[in-house]
């Protein structure tokens, strides 16, 4: 298991402990990828997981670019259309740094 996969598993477990329900992982399209798809009450939650072992080159949150946010939004839109879902959604980020988990709800 790669470090990225380990971080996604850790994030998934953490979010499940917070009351979210797992739906899918690593949803890939040619134009973007969604790390985790979860449900929280009436919302579908598209989660980007960022991992950094140290923040000497900027923390996990700083690793999320505007271009990447655009690709995630496009992938989420496609996911909703493909699954014929007309539901409220949000975009969360789980940042894992120095073995600490930071959950940013409705991050973008």
From Swiss-Prot:
It comes from the Bacteria. Coiled coil: none annotated. GO terms for molecular function: nucleic acid binding. SUPFAM superfamilies: Restriction endonuclease-like. InterPro entries: Restrct_endonuc-II-like, tRNA_endonuc-like_dom_sf, UPF0102_YraN-like. Pfam families: UPF0102. Belongs to the UPF0102 family. HAMAP family: UPF0102. This is UPF0102 protein Shewana3_3881. It comes from Shewanella sp. (strain ANA-3).
